[in-house]
Amino acid sequence: MSFPSSAASPARSEQAVPEGAAKEPMVTFEGVTKTFGGADGKPGFAALAGIDYTVPKGSITCIIGRSGAGKSTLIRLANGLEKPSTGRVVVDGVDVAALDEKSLRTLRRSVGMIFQHFNLLSSRTAFDNVALPLEIAGLGKKEIEARVAPLLDLVGLSDKAKRYPAELSGGQKQRVGIARALATQPKLLLSDEATSALDPETTQSILELLKRINAELGLTVLLITHEMEVVKTIASQVAVIDRGLIVEEGTTFDIFTAPKHETTRSLLSSSVGVKLPHWVTSGLKQEATDGDRVLVRLVFFGETAFQPLTARLVAEIGPDVNILAGTIEEISGQPFGSLVVSYPASAEVTARANRFYAETGLHTEVLGYVA
């Protein structure tokens, strides 16, 4: 992986991770547990209860979960801020817990980290904040200048190099934090709720920056967040953690469009697809009676997102089709649409509709019945 060496050359799309490289592991958690406390014969708190998970090289991987699920503990294991109680954490082929202090310091230079709170030194300019880890590493003034200037250019802050944190906006402070995290030319970037203190517009600009860094530098990004919009925008894959265990994992698109675990469905319930109004859900039944209408969620993605399937459904089963709600959005760069319709729950209409779904390959979910 190459980092920019001059202010004039941050664009390196040709050096993006080649196809297939993402299958190699950057971080591997092998049977990892972590227990806090437990002194004097008292039981400890199991923050992690047996994690087996791999973060591929070159990926942007998101860990999501409820508060207290173990997200922050998991990410702190990746740079040796915490050690596992049992199991192994392997970063780029190195068992982190097996390292002595000197080797651990070397490893940490290959792992950058950005935080919700920017942790900038108020007495240092943007340039000097980015330079700090290089000064600690013992680099000379000319080498620091050659490293910091292109990084500030990369994050769009060349004109703010001499500004102090108090003179910067929240988004600009986070960009300084990102540049500082990249100063030691890491292979892995850890992000702990890095956008949660930012407004939506600034969040989007930071996400675009992280995507560009990932693409141009081939940098692996592992982030935790409670913001599902962040995950949809940036992640290539997702892992869901609950009570110290990975309960579901997969590509971002698969997790968001077809969540399987109850925890995943709960986390995503308000961020994907259609949320029905209360006046509809309050009258929803799971069994049909004579004269009822069935509510069906139709899911469109890939090529089906651009086909006139709703019009064809009306042509197939008749004009008595009501559209109750609908949305279309982009998840991990792919179109995804969701439409809730109702039509008579009679055997004849249901048979025609089911035949149409089978012929078109349309994904459907029966939500219930209303009078």
UniProtKB/Swiss-Prot annotation:
EC code(s) of this entry: 7.4.2.11
Subcellular locations according to the entry: Cell inner membrane
Keyword terms: Amino-acid transport, ATP-binding, Cell inner membrane, Cell membrane, Membrane, Nucleotide-binding, Translocase, Transport
Listed GO MF terms: ABC-type D-methionine transporter activity; ATP binding; ATP hydrolysis activity
UniProt xrefs under Pfam families: ABC_tran, NIL
Domain ABC transporter: 27-268
Disordered as annotated region, ranges: 1-24
Binding site for ATP: G65, R66, S67, G68, A69, G70, K71, S72
Keyword Chloroplast assigned: no
Subunit organization: The complex is composed of two ATP-binding proteins (MetN), two transmembrane proteins (MetI) and a solute-binding protein (MetQ).
Known function: Part of the ABC transporter complex MetNIQ involved in methionine import. Responsible for energy coupling to the transport system.
Stated name of the protein: Methionine import ATP-binding protein MetN
